[in-house]
Amino acid sequence: MTKKIAMIHPTAIVHENAIIGKDVEIGPYTIIGDRVEIGDNCWIAPHVVIKGPTKMGKGNKIYQFASIGEDCQDLKYNGEETFLEIGDNNVFRESCTVHRGTAQDQGTTRIGNNNLLMAYVHVAHDCVLGNNIILSNNATLAGHTKLANNVIIGGLSALHQFTRVGEFAMIGGCSAVNKDIPPYFMATGNYVEAQGVNSVGLKRSGFNSKAIMEIKRAYKILCREGNSLEQAKIKIAEKLEGCPELQVLYDFICEESRGIVR
C-alpha cells in the first residue's frame, strides 16, 4: 500500500505489499521489495535496494547503491524467515550493506536511532546497534556483533563475530577487533589493544570530572597494573558506590565471553 503523498520516481519499483509512510521520497531505479515498511519522512536515493522483511522508522536517509535487508552471507542460512529492524533518523551512505538475521540467533538484525553509517560500511546478520553510533568508511561488522550507544569506529576497521563494544568506546582506523572493548575505552591496532580512556568524548557528552577520574582509575586496574581479569573485577567492584558510570563498565567486563581488550 503506497500513500499518495509519497514522491516515488516513475522508474522506481515498489512492491504492492510494501508500506510507505508520508512524505517519503524514493529516487530513480530504486527497488523496494515485499514486506518492506518505510516510516514517514524517509529519503531514499536512486539505485537503492531494500528487501524484506524490513521495517524502518521515520527520517532515515539512504544513499545510492546501498543494499538494505538482503539475505545474510552465513553459510548456514537456508532461506528461513528473518528480519531487519531500523529505528529513526539514521543515515546510510553510498554502498552500505545491511543484512537480515539468522535462525541460529534471534533472527533479527537491529539498528537503533541517529546512527551514521558512512560509505561501504557492512553490518552483517544478527548485529545489534544502539543509538548515536558512527561507523566510518569501510568499517565491517561480522555477524552477531553488538555496539552500545555512542560508539565510534574508524575507517577500514573490522570486528570479529560476537564481539561487543561498550558505550562511548572509540576504535581507531584500520583496527582488527577480536575481543570485547569495554565502555569508555579507546583502542586501536591489529590486533586491537587498549590505548586509554576516551576522555575528550566523555567530556563532550557531559560526564563530570569525578566520573572520568573513576573511569581512568578502573582503566589502570584493568590494563596497567598487571592484574588478572578476576583480580581487576574485585578491585573495581570496591569502587562502584556512587558512580553509576563505573557500574556500566563493571557489568560489561563481567559479561565478557571473547575476552577483554586490555
Swiss-Prot record:
It catalyses: a (3R)-hydroxyacyl-[ACP] + UDP-N-acetyl-alpha-D-glucosamine = a UDP-3-O-[(3R)-3-hydroxyacyl]-N-acetyl-alpha-D-glucosamine + holo-[ACP]. It comes from the Bacteria. It is an enzyme of class 2 (transferase). Transmembrane segments: none annotated. The keyword Cytoplasm applies. Its EC number is 2.3.1.129. It holds the Pfam family Acetyltransf_11. This is Acyl-[acyl-carrier-protein]--UDP-N-acetylglucosamine O-acyltransferase. It comes from Psychromonas ingrahamii (strain DSM 17664 / CCUG 51855 / 37).
